[in-house]
Amino acid sequence: MARKKTITREHILAAVYEVVSTEGFSGFTARNIANKMKTSTQPIYLEFKNMDELRNVFIDRVTAGLRNEVYERRFTDDCIVDLTINYVKFASENSVFYKSLFVDNHESGEKLNKFSHDLFFEKVNSDEKYSKLSTEVKEAIFTNCWVMSVGLSSLAASKRANPTNEELEHMIKNMINMSIEHPDVTLTR
């Protein structure tokens, strides 16, 4: 009779979360993850073909959680302001995890950038206030607000600033208005 599997995919993903949220992606190694579970690396490779597959599954799980839990909270009647407030709050409450995901350079950075871009466009395209704006203006709003959000989030994560929702709303609305008036913005990615 075969041995019963005691370490599941969920256990491994929980260990990955613990590692990345405390050490960042620099700690994303089979050995560190196995140590977190107090086991060998064998269960990891029984569940996942390789570390790239594990990273992709983990990032998919994280982005689903961000989409469904973090970015769905409403604070105002403006979807862009709400995205920013949620992003800054996430950074402030999960500073190491935020930096690991959105600041540090790692293999999933492009995937996370695409997630942020796609989520922004999903929100603005389904909002009456923004849906009729040109793609150029929406891109300008995204780029300007994204840069501002990353800066504010980095300040909040490092406890150098603690902006209130009202302050964030005021800054983002100013940035939206500037982007609408001056949409000629590019950012090489």
Please report, for each region that a protein language model flagged, where it lies by residue:
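Hydrophobic alpha-helical connector segments
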Residues: 70-96, 135, 145, 189
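Append "Primarily bacterial transcriptional regulators
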Residues: 28-35, 44
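Basic, helix-initiating cap at the start of DNA-binding domains
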Residues: 1-23, 32, 53-56
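Amphipathic alpha-helical packing segments from all-alpha helical-bundle domains
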Residues: 105-144, 170-180
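Amphipathic C-terminal alpha-helical segment
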Residues: 97-100, 146-164, 177-188
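HTH DNA-binding helix-turn interface
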Residues: 21-25, 38, 45-55
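Alpha-helical DNA-contacting segments of helix-turn-helix folds
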Residues: 53-62, 70, 101, 105, ...
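Amphipathic alpha-helical linker/stalk segments
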Residues: 56-83, 120-126
